[in-house]
Amino acid sequence: MKPAILVPVDNTPVSKEVLRFADDWAARVSARLVVLHCRSAAIQDLIERGELQNPEPSFEAHLQALQLRSEVEIVHLFADPADGILKLQDELEPELTIMAAHSHTLAGRLFLGSNTDMVLHQGSTPIFVYKQTQRDPQQVVVPLDLSSISESLLRKADELALARQGKLHLLHVLDYPEIHVVGGGAFYGVAIDGGFLQERREQLLEHGRKSLEELVAQVELKSPYQLHLDFGTPYLQALQLAERVNAGLMVIGAHDHTALGRLLMGSNTDYLVHNYEGSLYVHQELQS
């Protein structure tokens, strides 16, 4: 059986776009689509009492009208969206979950709302957060913290960039150098040598660049790429870089089952998911 791509949808216009996007993805990787449509127990009660028409036939007709190329399985669940997604992730073990987000008019507000946060933190698959955007889909920003997940994250980013004939922008954000002052006391003040600080920053940048170059050499990237190093807050630097290069995709990482749902940049990743104007691929190493 072909591997599955899970696609939760609702009744918003963006769902049509995300289904076509997921269809292209499935065709490229020879996967099948599992389209999930959830409805609450209250809605189901109205249907059973005859006060509301069963939406399943019209939903399936709408899906058929899209003329998707991939093999499609439709799953209707009586559940909250997040619970339904997590349930199917456990049952099907899909290789990817593709979820939609609204356009820039509601940037960062995912169509499942807080349920999406729950899926991001408790889910067991990589997640692609699709957003309607005017940004360049061929420019791909990849924040890297050089942790254990960075190699597999970079390989996935390279694969995604190749599929869209894109360019990778590899970002490593450094902490500002620490200054330890001994003696003198705060009353008198202490003069810090600006030349020393500049030298220390240059040393940290050089060390970070070498580490990033070693990672790139190990992965043997096939896509064109550019290295970016800076000091500051990771999510702010990532957003600023994405703005400068007009990036339509950002690839970020999540740890494996040893810290399930804890994204490598912690709250930084939550901020990016809700504030970045392009699509995001949240990478997670799957268990064999």
Please annotate each region the language model reported.
Residues 1, 21, 42-46, 53-54, ...:
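Structural beta-alpha unit
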Residues 1-52, 139-194, 219, 224, ...:
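Small/aliphatic-rich secondary-structure junction motif
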Residues 18, 55, 153, 208-211, ...:
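Hydrophobic alpha-helical membrane-association signature
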Residues 34-36, 73-77, 128, 171, ...:
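General small-molecule cofactor/ligand-binding pocket signal
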Residues 53-57, 191-207:
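A short acidic, glycine-rich active-site loop
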Residues 83-135, 240-288:
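Gly/Ser-rich helix-loop-strand patches that form or flank binding pockets
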Residues 205-217:
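Alpha-helix-centered segments that form part of catalytic cores
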